[in-house]
Curated annotation (Swiss-Prot):
Protein's recorded name: Auxin response factor 12
Gene from which the chain derives: ARF12
Membrane spanning residue stretches: none
UniProt-listed SMART domains: B3 (SM01019)
Residue ranges the UniProt entry marks as DNA-binding: 135-237
Start and end residues of each stretch annotated as Disordered: 1-24, 526-565, 629-648
PANTHER family registered for this protein in UniProt: AUXIN RESPONSE FACTOR 12 (PTHR31384:SF185), AUXIN RESPONSE FACTOR 4-RELATED (PTHR31384)
Domain comment as written in the entry: Interactions between auxin response factors (ARFs) and Aux/IAA proteins occur through their C-terminal dimerization domains III and IV.
Subcellular location per the Swiss-Prot or TrEMBL entry: Nucleus
């Protein structure tokens, strides 16, 4: 009896369950998919908001079919150039025939009301997790011949393949690799030839024939964390000249995608798109946070230098430098007011023909920019966000910088003027930041002005003695005044309230009184300088010291960061404490002067002016000395009202009471970074590129030494030691003049922090080295010439892979730091 007839005896067997669909049956390996897609591919995160560009989608169709959009294709005037959508689903696929990877995304446009709803920006996207142990090789003619084998570079074979047993002659082993469809391929790995080399022989020709590989295609071998060998394919771009009859024509594909997007935008319904990372010139589905950062928080201009990442043949990345030559619409007829490829560029290298003539803002990294986005590095800041004030990520007012005030429509109110800060994209502060009593403000301004021994503030006060002009005249003069003040601040490394702030907040009588007091104090200092000699103890009489706010009420002392009058008078306070002397209320109060629409309003009532005079008298009666970010108090004092202080031989100490003390350094350390007035849409009154915009809302990086260096130490000609910081470790000082190149510096830093070898190859280890220059710009270590780096470095930051990962979650793209 045959087995088939025997099997029929007995109870009938239940029918087998239906086979699941191909997509449900297999889940593609994400690591292999991203490796095949390329190191620059970054898929958005499911559940986040993205910006979809139909114009970029059309480019993918044109690149795939080798046919541009024809003029007879109907235009859809109701289809915006960019659609803000909710990303509901992302699925990774690979073509069964060609192994070409692509992604399927389900999008749903947001209506204007949803765009204005509170939204917390998520990460920039799913970072392309490139494998650490892999190699990519472009196939040659001999690699694809039926009689030969696949030649593997020696270092690649030793790093990726399991080790050979060299006791055998010849050394050989069998390799089993899985492709994107989870199909196993077996190869014979042998080490032979003259000279000896690694070859894949048996099984290789079968693989080449089955995959229809030709010279120019690339293969990837990956050794993953599960000790598995993965195999991927990247086909060379070969546009099809003749499309199969089963495939839609190019015109039909263009019309289809435009019609689907227009219908979805009109009905707020879901629609599906396909993204082919190897065929598409650029990503056309961008995370909303990345789009906002690039378009509204990075100001560019014609002539600005930039760099951009490109993929190399070895599946790594390389930066190319260029210059911005024009900012305009790429297609003003079909896609007006579009940010897609709105930047026309010129490339430096002779291979510029291979680079695109136009790029998008989120693809480039300007070299001279003033970002208004939260710092990339979670270093200690001088001024944390104040309690009771809504932050950028507040639950009740999340992402308030993405929303307009009453009557504005968020994205619907966009004006395409030029990439940078638009009227809609201006940052706005919570009203509580702008509410400060005039008397408190006047008191703090008086203390700050009195602590300056002359120089910059005195010049500003003298300038303000001129008769007050009409509001219209001030509106005309304000930009010029701001530009002059900002230039002076840049030269003296200070951030100072402009003349308008002081003029609107202090009455003429108060200014005159403060001028007289400044002159008296400077004369006293001149007298003291003649009496002081080195190596002696001195008693500073009460008339010789500058006034301080020690007589303020306790609630104001706490509010403005003044020290306790009962504290030890012989000790210096850290720079962070002195920086806090002028707190948010003062800063925000001063920023009100930027809004010239309020210039004709009364500054203070008569009662407030009387309170101001009373506060000034209290300030002038108190006693303290402010030096370069440190405050020396005289309370408690001795019976005769004086305090003893040792003055050493140090030149710095000898100059403490000198009237020639650099007022810029005093003001730099005493007054923290000023918060710009970004409420009520008046950011346009502040010049672009201003340091007000750079450090206003986010504070600045603190000097962990406690006191900012003096001007001599900040001089590049005299300062050779730089600070090096690493999370979880104590900061170190390093003399960079000991080294002659980056390799020596990396080796020393690796030994110093116990991570030897991790800094040599950042692409493999994940560790990154960045530095902050004297202009407070964050740059990648190694991009600049060595001499330029030595002359400009302020401090160095070592970023672990975890630090880079955290930065990605904060809404930044760590690829631009790799």
């Amino acid at each position: 009896m045959s087995s088939s007839s025997a099997a029929s005896i007995g109870p009938p067997q239940p029918p087998p369950p239906p086979a699941p669909p191909e997509e449900e049956k297999k889940c593609l390996n994400s690591e292999l998919w991203h490796a095949c897609a390329g190191p620059l591919v970054c898929l958005p995160t499911v559940g986040t908001r993205v910006v979809y560009f139909p114009q970029g989608h059309s480019e993918q169709v044109a690149a795939s079919t080798n046919k541009e959009v024809e003029g007879h294709i109907p235009n859809y005037p109701n289809l915006p150039a960019q659609l803000i959508c909710q990303l509901h689903d992302v699925t990774m696929h690979a073509d069964v025939e060609t192994d070409e990877v692509y992604a399927q995304m389900t999008l749903q446009p947001l209506n204007p009301q949803e765009q204005n709803d509170a939204y917390l920006p998520a990460e920039m996207g799913i970072m392309s997790k490139q494998p650490t142990n892999y190699f990519c090789k472009t196939l040659t003619a001999s690699d694809t011949s039926t009689h030969g084998g696949f030649s593997v570079p020696r270092r690649a074979a030793e790093r990726v393949f399991p080790p050979l047993d060299f006791t055998q002659q010849p050394p050989a082993q069998e390799l089993i690799a899985r492709d994107i469809h989870d199909i196993e391929w077996k190869f014979r790995h042998i080490f032979r030839g003259q000279p000896k080399r690694h070859l894949l022989t048996t099984g290789w020709s079968v693989f080449v024939s089955a995959k229809r590989l030709v010279a120019g295609d690339s293969v990837l071998f990956i050794w993953n964390e599960k000790n598995q060998l993965l195999l991927g394919i990247r086909r060379a771009s070969r546009p099809q000249t003749v499309m199969p009859s089963s495939v839609l024509s190019s015109d039909s594909m263009h019309i289809g995608l435009l019609a689907a997007a227009a219908h979805a935008a009109a009905t707020n319904s879901r629609f599906t798109i396909f993204y082919n990372p190897r065929a598409s010139p650029s990503e056309f589905v961008i995370p909303l946070s990345k789009y906002i950062k690039a378009v509204f928080h990075t100001r560019i201009s014609v002539g600005m230098r930039f760099r951009m990442l490109f993929e190399t043949e070895e599946s790594s990345v390389r930066r190319y430098m260029g210059t911005i030559t024009e900012v305009s619409d790429a297609d003003p007829v079909r896609w007006p007011s579009s940010y897609w490829r709105s930047v026309k560029v010129g490339w430096d290298e002779s291979t510029a023909g291979e680079r695109p003539p136009r790029v998008s803002l989120w693809e480039i990294e300007p070299l001279t920019t003033f970002p208004m986005y939260p710092s990339l590095f979670p270093l200690r800041v001088k001024h944390p966000w104040y309690s009771g004030v809504a932050s950028l990520h507040d639950d009740s007012n999340a992402l308030m910088w993405l929303r307009g005030v009453a009557g504005e429509g968020g994205f619907q109110s966009l004006n395409f003027q030029s990439p940078g800060i638009g009227s809609w994209g201006q940052q706005r502060l919570h009203p509580s930041l702008l509410s400060s009593d005039h008397d408190q403000y006047q008191a703090v301004v008086a203390a700050a002005a009195a602590s300056q021994s002359g120089g910059y503030l005195k010049q500003q006060f003298l300038h303000l003695q001129q008769p007050m002009q009409s509001p219209q005249e001030h509106c005309n003069l304000n930009p010029l005044l701001q530009q002059q003040i900002l230039q002076q601040a840049s030269q003296q490394q200070i951030i100072n309230p402009d003349a308008q702030n002081i003029q609107t907040m202090l009455s003429p009588s108060a200014i005159q009184q403060q001028l007289q007091q400044l002159q008296q104090m400077q004369q006293v200092q001149n007298d003291q300088k003649q009496k002081i000699q080195p190596d002696q103890s001195y008693q500073v009489p009460t008339s010789a010291v500058l006034p301080s706010p020690t007589s303020l009420p306790s609630h104001l002392r706490e509010k403005f960061g003044f020290s306790d009058p009962n504290a030890n008078s012989s000790s210096f306070i850290t720079s962070s404490s002195s920086d806090n002397m002028l707190d948010s209320s003062f800063l925000q109060g001063s920023s009100k002067a930027v809004d010239l629409s309020r210039f004709n309003q009364p500054v203070a009532s008569e009662q407030q002016q009387q309170q101001q005079q009373a506060w000034k008298q209290k300030f002038m009666g108190s006693q303290s000395v402010s030096f370069g970010g440190s405050v020396l108090h005289n309370s408690p004092t001795s019976k005769d009202g004086s305090v003893e202080n040792k003055i050493g031989r140090d030149v710095q100490n000898q100059s403490l009471f000198s009237p020639q003390v650099d007022s810029s350094s005093l003001l730099y350390n005493m007054v923290p970074n000023l918060t710009s007035n970004v409420s009520d849409g008046n950011l346009s009154t502040i010049p672009s590129g201003s340091t007000y915009l750079q450090n206003a809302m986010y504070g600045c990086l603190d000097d962990s030494s406690g006191l900012l260096q003096n001007t001599g130490e900040n001089d590049p000609a005299t300062r050779t030691f730089v600070k090096v910081y690493k999370s979880g470790s104590v900061g170190r000082s390093l003399d960079i003049t000991r080294f002659s190149n980056y390799a020596e510096l990396r080796e020393e830093l690796g030994q110093m922090f116990g991570i030897k070898g991790q800094l040599d190859d950042p692409d493999r280890s994940g560790w990154q080295l960045v530095f902050v220059d004297r202009e407070n710009d964050v740059l990648l270590l190694g991009d600049d010439p060595w001499e330029s780096f030595v002359n400009s470095v302020w401090y160095i930051k070592i970023l672990s892979p975890e630090d880079v990962h955290k930065m990605g979650k904060q809404g930044n793209d760590p690829r631009y730091l790799s």
